[in-house]
From Swiss-Prot:
It comes from Staphylococcus epidermidis (strain ATCC 35984 / DSM 28319 / BCRC 17069 / CCUG 31568 / BM 3577 / RP62A). A motif ('HIGH' region) lies at residues 30-40. The gene is cysS. This is Cysteine--tRNA ligase. The keyword RNA-binding does not apply. One of its GO terms (molecular function) is cysteine-tRNA ligase activity. Monomer.
């Protein structure tokens, strides 16, 4: 039985899917105007683990995460780079897949894009206007916030509280300062689409509502994203979706905590803005993922090199213990005794499932993995080892690895295929021919680190595995 903290009710609740055995999940994705930063990586990793655990428990998960490819940030970037908005979006969507792929995030069931759903967005807005929940004003379309009775229920704010900070910007023709934009009138030189309200483009909030509705239906099981999206983005999504769909938008709302850099909020103005594209050149992506899951998803994370170093050491400890289990297999026997070890392994697995059932507590799940490694290190020192026990160790290691998404072997230690080695030898030969001896030495040293020895023969360079 899985329980999760529901932001909507501010308490942990037992998860009950709309459809037995199936989880419909929508996670707010990035605005693709740049490479993603580590703040974007956190929800990608956290909710990937949530998905993996549901799948481990036997659920079919329909996991939808969008790309915002029409936005003020993209338009500004377009002017800055003198490239079209679609060109910029394509570039950074490709980069997103590369970055989250390096972090071992599973591909979503679907990654809808705003530009691909423009017709549905326009129809959705028109239906809200027809029902009196929205109104057109000088080419813009606004949502009547006070028309929706439940506004503020996610962020637990009243309309009176919100009225204090609300204001009407220059050029806006709102009926009420609390109303928000569904459709923006086109400005000269900006990307735009034809609509019954005139040329323009959608507001940010309506985009997610429509894509979630198109992909998952009127009501979804789980809607997730960063804490910063809770208000106004998710609050506005609820209002426009429930006004349109006449049904609850999402039964459970999950929000992950922020990432601070050396105890300071990450921001461009402070110069501590860290892109995943850059950091994975210096930090093993597996270590970065392990670091992220070592903290509960709702808690804030403080990122610094010392803490990342601790995560690296912890992951090495787990991997080294697994390697010892594999090595001990070579001299194991078919012993029937030592059942107490099987019991201890299963107890740790039960501990892992218990903490993951409790709001996906990956921090305590990592502790269970450390306990398994400690038990494995103790077991390999026994005079005799059982094949059955070693296999059970490996099975549970694999469960932890699959659920948490952290490979048991680093990419550096994975065995190269013969054709990969031949390709590297060919690249080294080319480098030597071009007198790029630094690159030639780099390839030689990399192969040596993987216990592959190069030998010069009359027939050319050959290799052997050490």
């Amino acid at each position: 039985m899985i329980t999760l903290y529901n932001t909507l009710t501010r308490r942990k609740e037992t998860f009950e899917p709309i459809e037995p055995g199936k989880v419909k999940m929508y996670v707010c994705g990035p605005t693709v105007y740049n490479y993603i930063h580590i703040g974007n990586a956190r929800p990608a990793i956290n909710y990937d683990v949530v998905r993996r655990y549901f799948e481990y428990k036997g659920y079919e998960v329909i996991y939808v995460s969008n790309f915002t490819d029409v936005d003020d940030k993209l338009i500004n970037r377009s002017k800055e780079l003198n490239e079209s908005v679609p060109e910029i979006a394509e570039k950074y969507i490709k980069a997103f897949y590369e970055d989250v792929g390096a972090l071992n995030v599973k591909k979503a069931t679907s990654n809808p894009r705003v530009m691909h759903h423009m017709g549905e967005i326009i129809d959705f807005i028109k239906e809200l206007v027809d029902e009196g929940y929205a109104y057109e004003s000088d080419g813009d379309v606004y949502f009547r916030t006070r028309q929706f009775d439940g506004y503020g229920k996610l962020s637990h704010q009243s309309l009176d509280d919100l009225k204090v900070g609300a204001r009407i910007e220059a050029g806006e023709q709102k009926e009420d300062a609390l109303d928000f934009t569904l459709w923006k009138k086109a400005k000269p030189g900006e990307i735009s689409w034809n609509s019954p309200f005139g040329k323009g483009r959608p507001g940010w909030h309506i985009e997610c509502s429509v894509m979630a509705y198109h992909e998952l239906g009127s009501t979804i099981d789980i809607h997730a994203g960063g804490s910063d999206l809770q208000f106004p983005h998710h609050e506005n999504e609820i209002a426009q979706s429930e006004a349109h769909n006449h049904a609850p938008f999402a039964n459970y709302w999950m929000h992950n905590g922020f990432i601070n850099i050396d105890n300071e909020k990450m921001s461009k103005s402070l110069g501590n803005f860290i892109l995943v594209h850059d950091i994975i050149k210096e930090v093993d992506p597996d270590v970065l993922r392990f670091f992220m899951i070592s903290v509960h998803y709702r808690s804030p994370i403080n990122y610094n090199l010392e803490l990342v170093g601790a995560a690296r050491s912890g992951l090495e400890r787990i991997r080294n213990s697994y390697k010892l289990i594999e090595e001990r297999e070579q001299i194991a026997s078919d012993l029937e005794e030592q059942s107490e070890y099987i019991q201890q392994i299963d107890k740790i697995l039960n501990q892992f499932e218990t903490v993951m059932d409790d709001d996906f507590n990956t921090a305590n799940a990592v502790t269970a993995w450390y306990d398994l490694a400690k038990l494995a290190n103790k077991y390999v020192l026994e005079n005799t080892t059982s094949t059955k026990v070693l296999n059970r160790f490996k099975e549970v290691y694999s469960i932890f690895s699959d659920v948490l998404g952290v490979p048991l072997k680093s990419k550096e230690t994975e065995e190269l295929l013969d054709e990969d080695i031949e390709q590297l030898i060919e690249e080294r030969n080319e480098a030597r021919k071009n007198k790029d001896f630094a690159r030639a030495d780099e390839i030689r040293d990399m192969l040596k680190a993987r216990h592959i020895i190069l030998e010069d023969t009359p027939q050319g360079v050959r290799f052997k595995r050490g």
